[in-house]
Structure formats: structure tokens, C-alpha cells
Amino acid sequence: DTYMTNQIELAAKTTKDNQTDYDGLYELHWKNGQDFNMRSSILGGELQALLEMRDGNNSENFSATLTKYTAGSAEDNTAATITLKASQADSACSDNSWNLSKLNIPESDGKLKIYNYEFQYDSFEVSVSADGSYEYTFTLKKPLNAGQSGHLDVALKRGKTTSTIGDDVGFRGIPYYMAQLNEFVRTFSANVNQIQNTGYDLYQEKGCDLFVAAPLADGTEYEMAELLYNKTEGCYYLNGEAQKGLAGADVVYTFSSK
């Protein structure tokens, strides 16, 4: 008898691929410890259909370009960071990397994949420039060791700088439609708030936001800045006022996931 069998085990994920992912989604492993390729094209059957429905993002996972990093230090209590750049002109960047209304990456517990190596991050910050380019600074959970720093050095030297979050799943599953819903809510809210901010009430007071978000922790409201790009005029509108600056110069908006 030369046949061999191996069993599949379920394990709760400790990281997320999308902003709207539920905590502890299952991933599959072979019982002998080997990785199970959930994206294999030969998987087939009900299992592949289930995974595509759960993880399908219409091949719209996040992608941007690595520009620099800091290694951090446990002794100095400094965090490691990875910086990415995204713009419409860069073909390596996904549409949702240079458009806040489409952004769908986890606030924390996400994984950056750079040159076939994964880095887990704790939070990130985005700076948007007047030319429409985005700069992401990801704060990693742990300082980088010598091997990880060397890997990033090699990636930068060889031009292997494409950095992704989540898998490319060519199916319109739950993550795709959740992202579509988020984009609609953000765009609608921003446009309505922009109209509110440019007007005045009956007491001649400047209008304020109609749509706001309240964190569950303390009940306070987020301060939402409406960032809308007008292609005709070539500038951003921030809270109803045009933000015009030299290309690549002025930062008109900064957002943090913390």
C-alpha cells in the first residue's frame, strides 16, 4: 500500500486582510505542519467556492511601492516602520491605495507582503499631498532583525518594491461588496458635509458636518475632513476650501488608524 493521506486543520487567523474582516476567520493548514494553499487554481469544488465567497475582492487588494524603512530597537523602545508611496501614475499601485474613499486595509493586525516576506503591522498613518500622491507609514509590531532589514535592503536594491496587503482573489465576494458599501458611505457623507461646510445657518453661523462617526470607546465624535479631488480644477477640497499647492509639495491631509 503506497497511498498516503493527510488531514486539514482549521486555525483562527491572528491577522486580517480587509478593514471589514471579522476577528478570528479560519485559515487552513495541513496537519503535518505544511501550509495549505487556499488560493490554488486546482482546488476546485465547494471548498474553493466557499473561500472565494468569503475572501473575494475582485482582485482589488491593496498595493503600493516601498520607499524606505526604519529598523527600530527594543533597547531604545523605538518601533520599526515601513514607508510606502502610492499614486495614480504608478502602475504598481492599486486604485484603493491612492483614494481614501476606497481604502480598505485593516487598522491594525494586518500583514504587508514585500518581496515574498510578510511584516505584521500594528497601525498606520497616511499623508496626502496636493499632487494626489499618498505616503503610508506602517508601524510594525516588533523591531526588525538583521535578516528582515537585509531583506528590505535587497528589495530596494533590486527594485522589488511592490508591497501588498491581502491576497488577489478574482471573485466578487463579501469583502468586495463591503468595500463598495464603505466607499458609497464615505463619498456620500463627504459630499453632503462639503455642502454643509460651505453654507450658513439661519443665525449666519458657518455650517458644520451633518455626518460624523462616534468611536465606541468614549462616545466622542471623529473630526472628519472631507477630502475630495476635483479633476477639472486640479486641486483638493478640504472642508469646503480648495487646497492648491505645488505638485508633490503641500500635505493637505493626514489620517491615522490609531
Q: Positions of the model-derived regions?
A:
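Structural signature of extracellular appendage/secretion-system components
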Residues: 1-258
